[in-house]
Amino acid sequence: MTSKLEQLKQFTDVVADTGDIEAIRLYKPLDATTNPSLVYKAAQMPQYQALLDTSINGAKSITNSAEQLSAASDNLAVGIGLEILKLVPGRISTEVDARLSFDTNASIAKARHLISLYEKGGVDKSRVLIKLASTWEGIRAAEILEKEGINCNLTLLFGFNQAAACADAGVFLISPFVGRILDWYKANTNKKEYAAEEDPGVVSVRRIYNYYKQHGYNTVVMGASFRNIGEIEALAGCDRLTISPQLLQELDQDKGELKRVLSPDNRGEAIAKLIDTEASFRFGLNQDAMATEKLAEGIRGFVKDQINLENLLKSRAQ
């Protein structure tokens, strides 16, 4: 029998959640996703050292030191993306600086800049997804960018009302997190072990998937942040799944049978349509302790690694 990875590819678009060129070459995903943490990790790999220097040199004409570091990190993120696009037939996701998560206009400006860097590298915007945090401001930025033909990937999505607001905004794709939701429930409840079917992250993505299909939304659901292959198997059939190299390897080595779980034709129990105003969005997020805490934690984590990356670039430039 073929591997579970090959079986999964029959009904789900498999995406590599990494900046590791060798892993992408090995597992042949459709797309790849990056984030500030993955770019920082990739920046320490031997194969990207020349690109670090190119990224720094490309920003030297900027006199303001903070702006110079920001520009160099943008150059690096896009440079890594350009290398990855030589290997994947689909798209690369590149993230807007997480420090802009609550600034709609600055997020739009940064997204346009990233797209311009890709275009200078010979890549059309149709092969790029701009990643934005699923804050109210991030969703509004995505709504405007989508109208300009810049497709977006809304990340750090933990709550149902975040998903509903993204769909209403017409964003191209969302990345609801699975493993980080599980982490929260393990840390904040007495239950420490979950079967895949009852895993709260799996339950969340299934609900979002069924809601989108029931109400005819075209927004792609791409499950993300997996802790084990059981979570992946429980979401087989989801539009897309972005998976780390370690879990891609486990799926590739497992020759067992994989059954499709999610399908547009099997939409589950009816879910009433949710219309988000800014007030209802913020209140709904506030009432969901898990989503509130994990969104804030996720933004802080990406900001930390963005700063770490800029410090790495700064030390290398000296």
UniProtKB/Swiss-Prot annotation:
Q: Which keywords are on file for this protein?
A: Cytoplasm, Pentose shunt, Schiff base, Transferase
Q: What is its main location?
A: cytoplasm
Q: Matching CDD domains, A to Z?
A: Transaldolase_TalAB (cd00957)
Q: Does the keyword Oxidoreductase apply?
A: no
Q: What molecular function terms (GO) are annotated for this protein?
A: transaldolase activity
Record's GO cellular component terms = cytosol
One Pfam match, given by its short name, reads TAL_FSA
Q: Name one GO biological process term.
A: pentose-phosphate shunt
Cited PROSITE patterns: TRANSALDOLASE_1, TRANSALDOLASE_2
Q: Which reaction does it catalyse?
A: D-sedoheptulose 7-phosphate + D-glyceraldehyde 3-phosphate = D-erythrose 4-phosphate + beta-D-fructose 6-phosphate
Subcellular location as annotated: Cytoplasm
> Which residues are named in the active-site annotation?
K131
Metabolic or biological pathway: Carbohydrate degradation; pentose phosphate pathway; D-glyceraldehyde 3-phosphate and beta-D-fructose 6-phosphate from D-ribose 5-phosphate and D-xylulose 5-phosphate (non-oxidative stage): step 2/3
Enzyme Commission number(s) from the entry: 2.2.1.2
Subunit-structure text: Homodimer.
Which PANTHER family does the record match to this protein? TRANSALDOLASE
Question: What is the protein's known function?
Answer: Transaldolase is important for the balance of metabolites in the pentose-phosphate pathway.
> Which family, according to the similarity comment?
Belongs to the transaldolase family. Type 1 subfamily.
Can you say what this protein is called?
Transaldolase
